[in-house]
Amino acid sequence: ILAFDEWELSLSRGSAFNPKWLMPGESLVSILWKFACANVLSGDALMHLISPCVDPSEGIALVRDDIELSRLCRILRLPEGVLRVSLLDTTLPCRPHPAFRYCRLCAAHGYHSVLYQLEDEDRCPAHHQALDTRCPYCGSETPYIVSARVIAAPFRCLSCRFHCSYGRLSLLSTIPAMRRQDRVSIRRRLLLRMGNTVEDEGSEPQPYCD
């Protein structure tokens, strides 16, 4: 088992991660689930890499003010614009929802959008389903944070470990699993809500929709 500093050295030489696996507006927790899966990282190891001063069991809020973007860029090897869009902006007038909100069909494709955490967004723009916060099996809610336990349970309830998705999900690339028209609908909604931010910060969502 590699020590945390050895994980960081190993990832500095290159990680098993392809930016083309991502969709426009993908939330940081969704990105981290893909990254952990591709690089066989435990929740504790990944938490230490992205926020070494944070207790992995306590976790950290997925907001821009609480996460060091430069470190995140170095570990994940993604453009800063992509990562900024993946995090909630606490300066926006709309409050973020404290519980993990998801579309069950998107979850089945291994995708979660940062837009789903905005309280005034109540439906998935691709599948037109109401966004859920409760586990389909036990009814519990999962807090919208990143922690060792959250990383270890992608698209699963923290209380009972039941899957939030329909059927077995693909953890890596969402692109082949989701219809192009659905990807376009998600991108359009993202641009409508965060258009200036997306374009100005250089997240370059267009290639992900090809």
Summary of predicted features, one role per range:
Residues 86-94, 108-114, 120-126, 140-148:
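Short, intrinsically disordered, charge-biased short linear motifs at domain edges
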Residues 102-106, 123-126, 137, 159:
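Short, cysteine/histidine-rich loop/knuckle motifs that typically chelate Zn2+
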Residues 119, 127-129, 162:
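An acidic- and aromatic-residue-enriched active-site/binding cleft used to recognize and process polar
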Residues 1-99, 104, 110-112, 177-183, ...:
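A structured, charge-rich N-terminal accessory region that forms the first stable segment of a protein
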Residues 97-103, 121, 132, 154:
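Residues immediately within or flanking Cys/His clusters that coordinate Zn2+
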Residues 65, 117, 150-153:
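Active-site-proximal structural scaffolding
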